[in-house]
Amino acid sequence: MIYIVNPILVKNNYIISNLYLLLIQEIIYNLRYYILFLNNNINVKFNFIYYKIIILLTNININSIDTIQNINNLLKIILTLKLNFININKIIKFNILIFILPFIYNNIIILNGLYKTCIQLFKKNNKIFIIKFKNNNKNIIYVYIYISLGLRIIFKISKLNIDCYFNNFKFNFLILLLYLNNIYINKNISLFIYNNIINKKILIYNYIKFIYSKYNNINNIISLKLFIIKLNKFNNIYINLLNILFSIKLNFSYYSDFYINNIYNKKFYSIIDNLLIKSKKYLKIFKYQLLNINRNIYNNITLLLNNKKYINIILENININPLVQYSDQVNNLSEINQKFKINMITTGLNSKFILNNDLRELPRNILGYISLINTNEGLTCGLVNYLTTNIFLNLKYLFVIYYKHIFYNRYNFKLLLNIFNKNFYNISFNNIYLKKNINFNKTTILTINKNTFKICNITQNIIYIPFNYLLSFIENLIPFIHYNDSIRNLMSIKMHTQIVPIIYPNLSNIITNYNFILNKYLNHLIISYQEGIVIYVSCIKIIIRDLFNRQIIYYLNNYKKINQNILLIYKPIVWVGEKVNIGQILAINSNLLNSEYSLGNNLLVGYGSYLGYEYEDAIIISRKILYNNLYTSLHLNIYEISLNIINNIPEICSINLSKMYYKNIKHLDKYGIIKEGTYILANNILISKLMFMPFIFNNKSLINIINFLFGSKLRIFKNKPIISTIHDIGRVIKIEILPNHLYNKTEKNNIYLKFRIYIGIQKYLQLGDKICNRHGHKGIISYISEINDIPYLNNKIQPDIFISAISIPSRINIGQIFEGIYGLNSLYLNTRYIISNNLNKNYYNNYNHIFNYYKYNYNNNFNINSKMSYNYNKYYLKNPFTGNMINNSICLNNIYYYKLIHMIKDKFRYRFIGLYSELTQQPIKGNTKQGGQRFGEMEVWALEAFGASYLFKEFFTYKSDDIKSRKILKNYLFNNYKIKNTFISETFKLILKELQSLAINIEAFCIFNDTNNLLENLPINIIY
């Protein structure tokens, strides 16, 4: 544990982590203030001899033996008091536990052993808002006065009436004011109020201001309250209402004709604000208890010491708070992206259906603060967005961003503007270079001011923001993002959060500036905290000897469990004898390669048809990818087995199992535990667990004779081995044996020993897996071709994958064509390109066309020996079976591809005729219940591509809701009965209904011969 006298404010990469440190500082400040207040209070009959505030950081999970269950990092605030009570003439010293808060660092909070992420919220500010609209050709004004959290007053103003809604009650506020004015205030005020309502010149706030300013007499207000008490049974409502209205500050600023959900009327809100409200409330209770401690000293001291009630309320509030979400840890990018999530509206889940589309659209006034593209899918589309990369929070809880002056070489300073202040400037997204630039002769520039685009002259009032600042972190990783459809870019962002880290990644040939390590990455790396020399490096730890001759050990915990069960491996990048400085990176994880974000490989892509397997979204790959392990990923399964003591009889592990063959126990040691390094398959024994049962027999004399002969009590033992499943085909990489007293020192249970078996699983690329590129183009592997069966060029170059040619124009992601052209050029030149997303910002639109034309020509000249087409970047391939030239040419590109987490091994399973629902007669859902799998549109396309007509028949008949056909199939399989003709299923009837909706009528007729040997058609109703 660590004792902290004063928490030091260290700048963090995330907003909520910095606010958490400020929260601790404010709690300490309030505690000191209350102690000084009580010490100077006359009514207090005790003196403070000594006090001290201790901040205790405990339960640190560094170097912990428990690598599965992440221990909650707790921050405890303890107040040590030494009081001298005057009445009893005694000095009492006691320690009071004020708060227990989970420690928040880098927007990560560990609750119940799980990683969770804190997200942000845009919340309505405490102001006055006005909404105007027409109802039955009548103008109605709604005035919302937000006082505090959950407290608001609503006025509905029509032409001659004002209705007030407060505390679930509705009443006529105008009649109330007129009635009160007639009794206590001048009667001329009523005429003044009436005229102003008709003319619509002032609002209800002005009435209160007028009354309060003209008759600013406390006695009048008190008499007014006394009258309202006698008025009716709802007196408390009016008292609270007038108290609130009279206490409103006169310098309130409000905006007319603005919606409540306007971005100007919102402020930043997070879990820290909720903790601040709870902490202030509890500190006031603590102050009151300390103030009245002298009445009953011993009872009040016990109340102070036993304050678990308030601590548990705060901890429970954090657990159920919707701003604390389950962390997405598929890769580092998905975790970073979730930390920048922000909710734009504060409505509940039930009201997302009825929200207007205007609230979902991204207004222009938040350009640079909220990402242009990145948002959620589904019901929360446009309501949950993500912050940009370079955004900060000021002291007024408003987002600010840095702007440069357009002539920043002359005016070398930056402007820090919020969402409202930036409206006073003309903002340009393209920089101007004064020297050696074609823009030198330009006098006008495109800018945005007050949410409108306009062309204005170049003046000093223009500020500049790079276009990368308008995008989120993931969007800046996509090269040529301008040339893709925005919806396809959104899909690409979601795919980046589903990428699985692989064992052997390669650096991308086409990158952006955001591929390198940024500040946001430093939270996932191991960094040196002192200057020194490396004296030892291994895959387990790094030892550094610092300037004070101390050995500092950095452990690389490669078996740490994360939420998605992906094995995150740390690799040292320093060597023995190297001098390291403060802040230098010592080790990186498997998401990085050479200090760059890289999770995929460069593949040679052929856009064309190959045996029809590339139908729709299907992808054909070469077996060379499997031989080189280009997309092999590591996953970690952990078995946690405990040995219990049941009825004072312990469970044991032994290799002496009854009714077991040698092949089942050959990988076990003498204690019945599987050996490290063993490659296990499905249904292998991991631990042989024996449970002893008492022998129950009615003849006690026989039992006594047996016990006398064998010298021990007769018992029955039962085999309960732990067996691996089909998802555990891998290698045992680590085994831990933990006694109970090492990891569980507080709770008393029947567990006396615990085993942990770590199984490393290599998942290779196989049929059914999904791969994607950086432009939102994903597909399922439909065929793995042999190397000898793939078409080739004259220089023996073969494409790695084949994709349908119509997949690019149908998705409008032209950016992958540009990436493929430059990637192919970089492959020939053995170079890499750092691409700016906006290539035309300084050179007009012709720059990109000329550059592409040059790259096309270079690629053609490099492949001068290959058979080229008349079109650029298109090649003729040879048939691998005949060696002849294939008639049509195809396009070849070099594109960076990833592997997604949607792997067929985790989802695909075998199921025969299983359980069906009694109501719908459809297969039940759920893997644990052996339920049915969803057979969607893309699966139907795959069956159509393979021509699986018999499989279609099974889905429409035997595996559908046709009960009779299912029974016929069951009797055929189990009882060897003859299979009969199938009946008409409900699925087939539904297809007929769908065809009838398309004006396609399908009828059935029974054809037979009549008495005159003429054919007649008898219609048959096949639907009912």
From Swiss-Prot:
GO terms for molecular function: DNA binding; DNA-directed RNA polymerase activity; ribonucleoside binding. One of its GO terms (cellular component) is DNA-directed RNA polymerase complex. GO terms for biological process: DNA-templated transcription. PROSITE patterns: RNA_POL_BETA (PS01166). It catalyses: RNA(n) + a ribonucleoside 5'-triphosphate = RNA(n+1) + diphosphate. Pfam families: RNA_pol_Rpb2_3, RNA_pol_Rpb2_6, RNA_pol_Rpb2_7. InterPro entries: DNA-dir_RNA_pol_su2 (IPR015712), DNA-dir_RNAP_su2_dom (IPR007120), DNA-dir_RNAP_su2_hyb_sf (IPR037033), RNA_pol_bsu_CS (IPR007121), RNA_pol_Rpb2_3 (IPR007645), RNA_pol_Rpb2_7 (IPR007641), RNA_pol_RPB2_OB-fold (IPR014724). Coiled coil: none annotated. Keywords: Apicoplast, DNA-directed RNA polymerase, Nucleotidyltransferase, Plastid, Transcription, Transferase. It is found in: Plastid, Apicoplast. It is an enzyme of class 2 (transferase). Its EC number is 2.7.7.6. Gene3D superfamilies: 2.40.50.100, 2.40.50.150, 3.90.1100.10, DNA-directed RNA polymerase, subunit 2, domain 6, RNA polymerase alpha subunit dimerisation domain. DNA-dependent RNA polymerase catalyzes the transcription of DNA into RNA using the four ribonucleoside triphosphates as substrates. In plastids the minimal PEP RNA polymerase catalytic core is composed of four subunits: alpha, beta, beta', and beta''. When a (nuclear-encoded) sigma factor is associated with the core the holoenzyme is formed, which can initiate transcription (Potential). Belongs to the RNA polymerase beta chain family. This is DNA-directed RNA polymerase subunit beta. The gene is rpoB.
